[in-house]
């Protein structure tokens, strides 16, 4: 019996560019292995694929080496946040408060 292949997408974005790769991987492939097979790391200089958080349709995958991909999955490689959202919110609130008190 021939091995079944699954069609998936791998996406990554920077402020300058977006990558959307359509791939076929063997059934039983883990998220980590699918990312490696996609060739994304070769296309994006400096991308630390093993150290990057990954999600499927917006939900973070906590164990990409264990989680298996399914037909039609969109694997999303996330970049780290540039600023702490809580700190940014605090700064905006302080600025708004100062403007109201004038």
UniProtKB/Swiss-Prot annotation:
InterPro entries: Mopterin_synth/thiamin_S_b, RnfH, RnfH_sf. SUPFAM superfamilies: MoaD/ThiS. Pfam families: Ub-RnfH. Coiled coil: none annotated. Belongs to the UPF0125 (RnfH) family. This is Protein RnfH. It comes from Pseudomonas entomophila (strain L48). The lineage of its organism: Bacteria, Pseudomonadati, Pseudomonadota, Gammaproteobacteria, Pseudomonadales.
